[in-house]
């Protein structure tokens, strides 16, 4: 399937297979969104959200919850797949700003640049962890922005994260013991 957004990236069999499985994953399928393209290096992704019975609201426009849910997991998954097993990646928060009602099919492009990856790797190497914001824009066929979502992702070195998590657990146990 041709991506809506022009790209120089290619989709591998592995990324095509992952995209296909994600499209049929019940929790994502229920959002009404469809992944159209997933680059082989997981740095670019394109999603479509059609206006139809599962995605429209009382006034006949795209339901805000559909816009939000169809945009949910991807930056976390892209980072997780691209950075590899030595990193921990979590979604921390997200917010949405509606610009214009969606009265037709909308598209979103997710892009993580080489500069983003370099910044992430360098910061995690020196600080152990990083929180980074990513912007998602839902646009129509004329590239008019209908909604913007900012997703905040937490990225850490796996060993740093496990140590931090262990320190937190030990602190909780110490606090509980001191209460007795």
Can you describe what each PLM-predicted range is?
Residues 31, 43-45, 90-94, 104-108, ...:
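A generic structural signal for short beta-strands and their flanking turns/coil linkers
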Residues 54-74:
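Hot-dog-fold acyl-thioester-processing enzymes
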């Amino acid at each position: 399937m041709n991506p809506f957004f022009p790209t120089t990236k290619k989709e591998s069999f592995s990324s095509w297979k992952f995209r296909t499985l994600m499209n049929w994953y019940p929790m994502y399928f229920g959002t009404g969104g469809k992944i159209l393209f997933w680059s082989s290096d997981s740095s670019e992704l394109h999603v479509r959200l059609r206006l139809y019975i599962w995605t429209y609201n009382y006034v006949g426009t795209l339901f805000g919850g559909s816009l939000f849910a169809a945009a949910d997991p991807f930056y976390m998954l892209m980072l997780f797949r691209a950075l590899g097993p030595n990193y921990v990646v979590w979604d921390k928060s997200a917010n949405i700003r509606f610009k214009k009602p969606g009265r037709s099919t909308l598209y979103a492009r997710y892009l993580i640049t080489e500069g983003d990856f370099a910044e992430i790797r360098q910061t995690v190497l020196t600080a152990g962890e990083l929180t980074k914001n990513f912007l998602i824009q839902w646009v129509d066929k004329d590239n008019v922005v209908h909604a913007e979502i900012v997703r905040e992702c937490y990225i850490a070195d796996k060993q740093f994260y496990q140590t931090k998590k262990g320190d937190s657990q030990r602190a909780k146990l110490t606090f509980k013991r001191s209460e007795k």
